């Protein structure tokens, strides 16, 4: 038994070499398309297997299981699921702009539904698909052995149409990815013809023909032309695509919005689910309902909350929050004709395709020319045989080795003699000289044409252009499949916030928040608080009279502000809903709840004894996570947020020292810790109060309201320690004993 040979190598180098081999295999054999035919190896093998099965567009369908079996058995030694998924995608009209496979059965839906099992579905090639493999039998492309060496497969497809840009491609390899959107074939053909006529054309010339992507699902590209041009010039970028919608008038002045097209690669079911979640979370108050009325065409019906809602504003709010507006990435990373992957711009991709077509036409012409020369040689021999028919027949009948004798006597070549000997005697007798002469003459004309094509580049490019025009005519803008589906409409995005309160009926409400953080609203003002019920162990904390159109500010003990629309607060006489469901307040307490008023000054104070004034406009939060305004040190909390409705402020803390000073001494800030309000030593600030000096300082002690007019003794500068409060001040060191 032979001993295993062990070779000592550096582990890092070995790992590096193997990973590099894996990466190259992934890039070259799986993830990136070839710039010439726009296909990956699995696509190429699948389509070639269908060609071998003769699944022509005018033939019958065959079970997909048969096709997949041939692919994995002969060409692609991978899982059947991966191959079938590829087949399904090539047949989906919402995935490919120009489907390559004609499927029969359930091939999935735009909702994201899976296709039926391969044993139930059937398929065949489309007319577009046949163009990819046109003339493949005329030595136009190289073939290589399959994985087991038992058969041959094409290295590349002849590709009579620019499949890479027409159908697009996407894939992720090791360290690189590609994402090429589909385009309109008619426009691509125009660009190719222009490039043939003007070989030195620049990208800007090409962009005049190719305006932008053309998605199978339609939609509207809303980016400016400059953005699209920049993406095509660099080969990288992104484009924004919006759904197409229309306003549908109903009776009594009402209307509904109907979405007829959605962005490319957006699943309709997930889009509806996304909108439904926003409806449930009350994030889109201008929308009351959404329903799916789609059949074989998209029809999403969106009902506005009120007939007075501007449909444009409704849709703008949906575009911002949902996939009704989507961003399509563009990264034209492909494998070039030199087998090197790189990012190409649109001009380079079109040039590579034209060079490929030039090579295909050259190889095809050479192949046909050789076939004609071969036939002409045979015809020359057949004519000699016709002129010496009796002698030929006699030699064939009487001689054991007629081949050598015929070559010697009649100066025939081996090919000519083989052709004569392979012809039946009966057929030899029926030979007519004129037929031979006519065929010989026609072939000579074809030979002259082919030689002109091969010897004259202008003639060759004429053929390339003619074939591109043929494709354009067959699948142009005037055809059902060729008409442009995606349109362009420049939209300038603004940061303007839609005032949704304009569409809410203004009604008085009373907002109730309990100590445990349960919030609700009741209709009207002057509510009988004795009828309000709370959960066991809970009680009232804040009672706030407001209107449904108001915005409510919630201040947490960590100094973070949250904003709620009053109309979105749970209504009814139940216990309401937890504030944690409405905002991300975490385990922090609620310091205060108040109605937002524009340009109102608010006083913030923390238990560390610091505070500052802030404009109410600065504390408005746009998200559920809120906005951090006051920075509170560890171990301390924000104890107060009060509207400034007086000229003086009173502070008191654990040290039971009362300090009164002018509110003008406190600076206005946007955020921060603030300045020292009252000085403490090993104590915390417990409460503050804003009041007018003329009215005096009041407090509530066990239900008795006390007003102190003489506050001179407690006056001081901001940052002082203060003095003991007057007799009768609450023992809890707060301005209310409750």
Curated annotation (Swiss-Prot):
**Where does the record say this protein resides?**
Cell membrane
Task: Offer a single GO CC term for the protein.
Answer: extrinsic component of plasma membrane
PROSITE patterns registered for this protein in UniProt? TOPO_IIA
This protein's membrane topology, according to the annotation, is:
Peripheral membrane protein
SMART domains, per database record: TOP4c
Residues marked Interaction with DNA (site)? 40, 76, 78
Q: Which UniProt keywords apply?
A: Cell membrane, DNA-binding, Isomerase, Membrane, Topoisomerase
- Per the similarity annotation, which family is this? Belongs to the type II topoisomerase GyrA/ParC subunit family. ParC type 1 subfamily.
Name by which UniProt lists this protein:
DNA topoisomerase 4 subunit A
Organism in which the protein naturally occurs:
Rickettsia conorii (strain ATCC VR-613 / Malish 7)
